[in-house]
Amino acid sequence: MGLMHVVVMGVTGSGKTTVAKGIAQARQLEFIDGDDLHPAASVAKMSAGTPLTDEDRWPWLDLVGEWLQERPRAVVACSALKREYRDRLRAMAPGTVFIHLAAPHSVLAARVEKRLTDEGHFAGPDLLASQFEALQPLGFDEPGGVIDVSTASPTEVMEVALELVDALDV
């Protein structure tokens, strides 16, 4: 087993943290939720429903990349919405693969609203539309895969995610 860097990506409410934690546990990888690396100013901005700009994101992405770089086998939950964000992470941690959790806006809006009510998560429904606008799907040349989480059960999503990780582990 060599280096293994996995980024579970997608818009808010897609299940990134749950899936990344499951992968970490099942494959003995270190885990971090990329949200935990956001500076307080960015969290405050998102809590107010203000989308982050690229300028807000670059320092955060650098922290995510550094975290991956320092660990031989790790998984991170990180939105990684744009190709240039993913390119930056790959430049810092070569060989990083991306698992994109995808679902329509309508499905995720209900999840985000519930999470906001139940858990008080900082990313509310106001951010969802801007994240969908920013989202650039994985390119054909980007290592990784896409999982449709709109109708699959959490167990099914995890099974597919683990199959992807195993197939991508070099």
PLM segments and residue spans:
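Walker A (P-loop) ATP-phosphate-binding motif of ABC ATPase nucleotide-binding domains
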Residues: 5
